[in-house]
Every structure is written in C-alpha cells, then in structure tokens.
C-alpha cells in the first residue's frame, strides 16, 4: 500500500502550493488543487503551530481514504507535500529529506540525518 502511495504522489498534480506571511509572521501553506483517487470524501484540516525557535506556521492536512498528506512550510522559501508513512507512535510524514512527526498537540520537523535516523528536530506545539 505504501509503495502505491509513493507512486501516486509521483503522479499527483500539485498545481499550486502557496506560502505567504501574515500580520503575525505566520506562514500558511495551502494546496489549491490535488487529485487523489477513490470515492471517499476529502477531509481537510488546518493546524497552527509555534516552534521552539519562534517560527509560526500553519500545516494543512489532507485525508482521503488510505491517503494522508500534510502540506508543511519547511522554510521561509519552501513548502512541501508530505506523505504519511509507518510510525511506531503518532503520525509520521515524509518528503525528501524531511520528516514531520506529530503526536497529540506536539510535532517535530526533522531535516538532518545521522546513521539512518532523523536528528536535530525543531519541536513545535499547536496554538
């Protein structure tokens, strides 16, 4: 199933992913068009986060059937679409070198790796 999801993501037409600031310097990620297969209803949810480094941003979660995605602004200039992957605890999403791992109201964004494990994550909390 996960292999099929990765193949799906390679073919998913993400026409526009926009990232913009607001008055309180919070970044917002938004997907304007994303085609996912199946007849299930698309469930979307936006969650605001504030991180230990002071950064504020909004993550958009998209769920449809077996497909779960998170649109995360990983930096001031880059927003990525993450795919849900297997985790022992919480919800774990991957995009390239990045991991977005949530559990309850807490989340961590990892961008560096050592020995096959993510390191130096930035901890964030829902606001």
Swiss-Prot record:
The keyword Ligase does not apply. The record marks 89, 103 as: Directly involved in lysozyme active site inhibition. It comes from the Bacteria. One of its GO terms (cellular component) is cell outer membrane. Gene3D superfamilies: 2.40.128.200. It is a lipid-anchor. A lipid is attached at residue 19 (S-diacylglycerol cysteine). PROSITE patterns: PROKAR_LIPOPROTEIN. Keywords: Cell outer membrane, Disulfide bond, Lipoprotein, Membrane, Palmitate, Signal. Residues 1-18 form the signal peptide. Disulfide bonds join 51-124. Its main location: membrane. The keyword Coiled coil does not apply. A lipid is attached at residue 19 (N-palmitoyl cysteine). It is found in: Cell outer membrane. Belongs to the MliC family. Type 2 subfamily. Homodimer. Specifically inhibits C-type lysozymes. This is Membrane-bound lysozyme inhibitor of C-type lysozyme. It comes from Pseudomonas aeruginosa (strain ATCC 15692 / DSM 22644 / CIP 104116 / JCM 14847 / LMG 12228 / 1C / PRS 101 / PAO1).
């Amino acid at each position: 199933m996960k292999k099929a999801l990765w193949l799906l993501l390679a073919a998913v037409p993400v026409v526009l992913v926009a990232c913009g600031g607001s008055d309180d310097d919070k970044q917002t990620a938004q997907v304007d068009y994303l085609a996912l297969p199946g007849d299930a209803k698309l469930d979307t949810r936006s969650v605001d986060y504030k991180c230990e480094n002071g950064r504020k941003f909004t993550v958009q979660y998209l769920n449809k059937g077996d497909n779960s995605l998170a649109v995360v602004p990983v930096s001031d200039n880059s927003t990525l679409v993450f795919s849900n992957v297997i985790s022992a605890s919480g919800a774990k999403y991957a995009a390239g070198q990045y991991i977005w791992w949530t559990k309850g109201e807490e989340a961590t964004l990892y961008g560096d790796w050592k020995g096959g494990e993510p390191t130096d994550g930035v901890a964030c909390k829902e606001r």
